[in-house]
Design a protein with these regions (language model features):
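Structured C-terminal helix/loop/strand segments within mature extracytoplasmic catalytic/sensor domains
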Residues: 144-254
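Aromatic- and histidine-enriched alpha-helix N-cap/loop-to-helix transition segments
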Residues: 1, 44-48, 131-134, 202
Length: 254
């Protein structure tokens, strides 16, 4: 969500220039990826780029203001209030040494746009927000619906961002297993190490699944199978020639 908020505040091209949109082919928490990308975070959908995106969020220099903007934006995407799981936040804060290294390495390369410790703390807090599968599906549906939440009717972000978001999900969403996923399903999707996965078909629907057991890349094993089945059953391959939507039906469902 922070990547979408950053693009909504600055525009897609500025975020592309400051962070990037290229897949790394490496684990989501890789430090080596920064070095191999010529000091560039590469994409806001892995840890380095997400920390960089947190540093960009306005108001710059105001931790409380940034956090309020992020929480409000996520709640608008989800269609209902969200909250941090305090136990998870405390645990992550006590052990996030790798991410701290990433934040300061990015600072060294001028790819952090605010205080690095502030950016890291905000990133850690946002990663500790708990959502339901329904909220995750509503977020996906909002992305699919050109930024308009289909449950609340609220315009959450600029409609021209949906293709950019979907393209990043398609190329980076499953970390180093993205190619296999896209080849198999043709569904732009974003996974998280909490066990949730959201899929987006622009103009059609958003879908989500949740199950904690993860594979080696940090992707939910069961949620992958569920979404792959749904994508095949409903013909959701965005590279295919058919669509599940019929005339007269609602275009976006959560």
């Amino acid at each position: 969500p922070t990547a979408i908020l950053a693009m909504n505040q600055y525009g897609g091209q500025e975020v592309l220039g400051k962070i990037g949109a290229d897949a790394t082919g490496l684990p989501f928490n890789s430090i080596m990826a920064i070095l191999l990308e010529n000091d560039h975070p590469s994409t806001p959908l892995v840890n380095a780029g997400a920390i960089s995106a947190c540093s960009m969020i306005k108001p710059v220099g105001d931790s409380d203001g940034k956090w309020k903007a992020i929480v409000s934006f996520i709640a608008d995407l989800a269609g209902s209030d969200v909250a941090v799981i305090d136990e998870l936040y405390k645990s992550e804060t006590a052990t996030n040494f790798n991410n701290k290294s990433i934040a300061w390495l990015l600072k060294n390369y001028n790819r952090i746009y605010d205080d690095p410790d502030m950016a890291l703390d905000i990133y850690t807090r946002q990663c500790s927000i708990g959502v339901t599968a329904r909220q995750l599906a509503t977020m996906a549906a909002t992305i699919a619906n050109s930024g308009v939440n289909p449950v609340t009717g609220k315009a959450v972000f600029k409609p021209e961002l949906t293709p950019k978001i979907a393209s990043m999900m398609a190329t980076v969403g499953f970390y180093e297993h993205t190619g296999d996923w896209l080849f198999t399903t043709g569904l732009p999707a974003k996974t998280g190490v909490g066990g949730g996965i959201m899929g987006v078909v622009p103009g059609v629907m958003g879908v989500a699944a949740f199950a904690p057991p993860l594979d080696g890349a940090g992707n939910s094993v069961k949620a992958q199978k569920a979404l792959a089945f749904i994508a095949g059953h409903l013909n959701l391959n965005v590279f295919g020639t058919t669509r599940c939507v019929m005339a007269g039906k609602e275009p976006v469902k959560a």
